[in-house]
Structure formats: structure tokens, C-alpha cells
Swiss-Prot record:
Keywords: Cytoplasm, Hydrolase, Serine esterase. This is Acetyl esterase. Displays esterase activity towards short chain fatty esters (acyl chain length of up to 8 carbons). Able to hydrolyze triacetylglycerol (triacetin) and tributyrylglycerol (tributyrin), but not trioleylglycerol (triolein) or cholesterol oleate. Negatively regulates MalT activity by antagonizing maltotriose binding. Inhibits MelA galactosidase activity. It is found in: Cytoplasm. The gene is aes. The active site is at S165, D262, H292. Homodimer. Interacts with MalT and MelA. It comes from Salmonella newport (strain SL254).
Amino acid sequence: MKPENKIPVLTRLSDEMKAVVNFQQPGLPPWPADGDIETQRQYYLLERRFWNADAPSMTTRTCAVPTPYGDVTTRLYSPQPTSQATLYYLHGGGFILGNLDTHDRIMRLLARYTGCTVIGIDYSLSPQARYPQAIEETVAVCSYFSQHADEYSLNVEKIGFAGDSAGAMLALASALWLRDKHIRCGNVIAILLWYGLYGLQDSVSRRLFGGAWDGLTREDLDMYEKAYLRNDEDRESPWYCLFNNDLTRDVPPCFIASAEFDPLIDDSRLLHQTLQAHQQPCEYKMYPGTLHAFLHYSRMMTIADDALQDGARFFMARMKTPR
């Protein structure tokens, strides 16, 4: 699409979102567009430090979990000594960026608002690790903690998955993988999905939105996909293009959150409409005036905190509902 035909989203953002876009961190160098992947990962970690500051304090524990691909680092956030459920978190970053530190504040707030133990999974990044490794690592982590629950004071009778952006895809894909492969790790009571991508190759929102401000141009999205997938055939896999999976039955309740000016918003809309059409429990909420990745900015955006609390409320309600 000709760039001039795109919607000028920067003029339509909320005041909070504009403040974030215009905020300059002192001493932060520009994004290393021409740097290699390791340089970009280090920059992303540095840039996110400000946004992760002043997070709630709570007991945390790091654990290396054995998987078929080697040990995967996890971090357990325990807001209280006992927990009614366990929530696994998959971070975003286009499959190529991010770790437990870049999303630390999000996980701490989610633990605080749910009152549950949140386990962040530092899955292997692409292109070094290709589909479906991150999903299989996530499943291995769930299996490990289901077998060692007493050792970590976990309640794994009720579990959930949560994630933002690429992590949202991994969260839903992992839950479907457990269902499809008949792997028992606990009763999946809910999945919390913030502005994920779920398999669309093109859409109205992907044409109208996306630019240098969010790193989600068509070229960017193609790059993330090529880094993650092994080959072109993987695009149609039911655990990548989740719309090719069976969404008509036994899908855990989904909280589906989107950002108004996100190129990926149509993925969330289609997911919601598909689940709703087949009477699968779900809730959809769009956060006006926001860009993709707004969940990171709760230090400056009350709506980011609202989005986390909305997901937490959804999860807590499912803790009380027999399934």
C-alpha cells in the first residue's frame, strides 16, 4: 500500500500514547537499525529498563527447566505464599527479541492483580530457534512444573497462559498444542491475549496501519515470520496460523485485547468473531488511542494498567468457575 494512503495514526493517538511516543530517555542512543540481532537485543533490553522500573516487589525465584532443547530459564513471581492457580507468561518481541527482564513489570503487575503465581518462560529466540521450538519448550515447562508442583508451592490444578504480541500467539498455540496432543498439565482455565498475531497474512488493518513508530510495517512482519518459521509450509500449520486449527471446540476461555491503531488488530477481531460464532467463551476489548505494545508503558499510561487489570479480572473470574 502506498504510504501516503495509510491512516496518519500519530495524529489520532490518545494524549497518554502521544506522551510515550514523544518521550526521550536521557542518554539512550538511537535504535541500531543496521546492527546485528544481538546488538538489537541488547538495545531492546536497555530501552526497556526505564519502563520496568518501580514494579511491585514480591518473592521471585529463577529455575532452569529441562526441555528436549536444553534448559530453559523460568522466573516465578509469587505475590503470596499460596496461590489458587498458576499463570504462564510468554513475552512479545516478534519471536526475535525480549526476555524475562524486558517484560518484568508486566509479569509483576499481573501476579499482583491476580494474586497468583506467574511463571515467565524465557523461550529460545529466533532465528536461532525455529518453529515449533518455543511452543515445545513452553509445553515442557508446563509438564515440569505439573510434576514438581509441591517443590515450588504451586497450584497446577488450575493453570492459564498469557502473552503479548508474538507471546500471545505462543500462549494460544501452546494451549491448543496441549489440547491437540492430549498432554495433561492442569486444567487450562483461561488464556490472556494482548494484541497478538494469530496467522493472518494480510488484512485491512495491516494495510492501513504500521510504520517506523511501531516496527510493524509489512516488511517488518515478513522479517519476523521468516525468522520464526522453518519454511513456507509452516505458514499454514495449525499452531502458527491458528485459524487453521479447530476453534469450534474445547478452546479455553480467552481474553482478547487489542490496540486501536495496531496493524494486528484484525487478527484479534477475527479470533474473537470466530470463537464467538462457535460459542467458545471469550471476551474482546479494544483500547482506544493506543499503539501496539502499549502494555509496556504503565508508568505513563493508566490505560496500560487498566488492560492488565482487565485481563487479571477475567482470569480471577475463571478461577471461580467450574469447568
